[in-house]
A protein has these predicted regions:
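Active-site-proximal alpha-helical scaffold in enzymes
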Residues: 107-135, 174, 279-300
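Short glycine-enriched loops at secondary-structure junctions
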Residues: 24, 83-89, 139-140, 179, ...
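Short glycine/threonine-rich loop-to-helix capping motif typified by GTGT followed
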Residues: 94-97, 236-251, 316-323
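Short, well-ordered amphipathic alpha-helical segments that serve as non-catalytic structural scaffolds
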Residues: 56-72, 120, 205-220, 287-292
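Condensing-enzyme catalytic core mediating Claisen C-C bond formation in acyl metabolism
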Residues: 1-51, 151, 156-223, 257-273, ...
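Short, high-confidence coil segments that cap the C-terminus of an alpha-helix
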Residues: 78, 129-130, 228, 301
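Short, well-ordered, mixed-charge alpha-helical segments that flank or form enzyme active sites
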Residues: 90-91, 141-146, 191-195, 313-315
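Conserved beta-ketoacyl condensing-enzyme motif
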Residues: 18, 52-109, 227-242
């Protein structure tokens, strides 16, 4: 069967099964509406380590190990690890990989990293290059603030369009056989830049990339949005979500009945001071590996599209007054 459908969508003939998923979050996330869904809520942001970066590395390592243990496998059984984060040189993911001893592909897609890894891992299994693949992503409020914004000690105020970086790590274990939801389609994202240069308005910067990926899937497959139980973007927040709904409607595509954003699911915007919602690699990673995956396992959801969204700015690009390019990778997951 032909694997490429239209210009962007790839159908996986040997659909990888997501046999396990694991999530770890920080204290603030553990006070949100999904608090009972996570595998572990850590009691403080340092997680017993000396630095926030080491804490983040420990979180993603633990989440990856959890997924392997859940199906009674060993790390030696895993063929590839695709993982990444927001920090320079992928410090958290690389140092976790150092401890795991699995062939490691370090990936950077900003906050799109989770579905980027799932796309690549799925192709590895579909192409019969691997039997077991781990995918993971993490972020940490304190590490991201220090790298991309300001030292926490300054106490800078943020506009209401800003979002709160999730402290969390999520992982999934993919395999060519087994029981569980399967990845049927992947939609690799293009880099889109509509000229937004405000680092405190990431939702507006990333929404065009999500729109491009979601629209490409429906244009390629002629699928019906109402056939989905859920379409979830990664971390567009309140502002970005509304942009996606309105601009897709202008293209005669209405996903509003089944659409949510992981950045709105992980926090209670009325009770927690997170402004526009959650963000970070860990946002879509933890929401998928907890709430969404549980719904798929229980077959309360049978068809889900996850589109993690990433803003590809850097401290250097910001200082050089560049606009913010963004990317969004999509996966369609089904129970069949």
């Amino acid at each position: 069967m032909k694997k490429r459908i239209g210009k962007r969508t790839i159908r996986l003939n040997n659909m990888p099964t997501i046999v396990a998923a694991s999530s770890i979050v920080g204290p603030k996330e553990g006070q949100g509406p999904l608090k009972d869904k996570f595998d572990l809520v850590i009691s403080d942001d340092l997680y017993g380590e000396k630095t926030w970066e080491l804490a983040e590395s420990k979180m993603v390592q633990t989440a990856l190990e959890m997924s392997v243990k859940k199906v009674n496998k060993n790390l030696e059984d895993v063929d590839f690890l695709f993982a990444g984060d927001l920090i320079n040189q992928l410090f958290p993911a690389s140092f976790a990989a150092r401890e795991l001893g699995i062939p490691f592909f370090g990936i950077y897609g900003a906050c799109s990293t989770m579905t980027e890894g799932m796309c690549l891992g799925s192709m590895a299994i579909d192409g019969e290059y691997a039997e077991y693949v781990l995918c993971g992503a993490s972020s940490h409020y304190c590490t991201a603030e220090r790298q991309f914004r300001f030292p926490l000690e300054l106490g800078n105020q943020k506009p209401m369009t800003a979002q709160w970086t999730v402290t969390g790590a999520g992982s999934v274990l993919l395999t060519k056989e087994g029981e569980g939801p399967k990845i049927k389609y992947i939609i690799p994202g293009k880099v889109i830049d509509k000229g937004i240069d405000d680092g405190n308005n990431m939702g507006a910067a990333m929404a065009p990339a999500a729109i491009d990926t979601i629209y490409s899937y429906f244009d390629d497959t002629k699928d019906d949005p109402d056939s989905f139980d859920l379409i979830a973007t990664g971390d567009l927040g309140k502002v970005g979500k509304q942009i996606v709904i309105e601009l897709l409607q202008e293209k005669n595509l209405d996903i509003s009945k089944v659409y949510t954003d992981c950045g709105l699911e992980i926090f209670n915007l009325e009770e927690q001071d997170v402004h526009c919602g959650g963000s970070g690699c860990g946002c879509s990673a933890t929401v998928f590996a907890s709430y969404i995956y549980e719904k798929l396992i229980k077959k309360e959801f049978n068809k889900v599209m996850l589109v993690s969204t990433g803003a590809l700015l850097s401290p250097t690009s910001t200082l050089q007054k560049q606009t913010i390019p963004s990317v969004a990778h999509g996966v369609v997951i089904v129970n069949e």
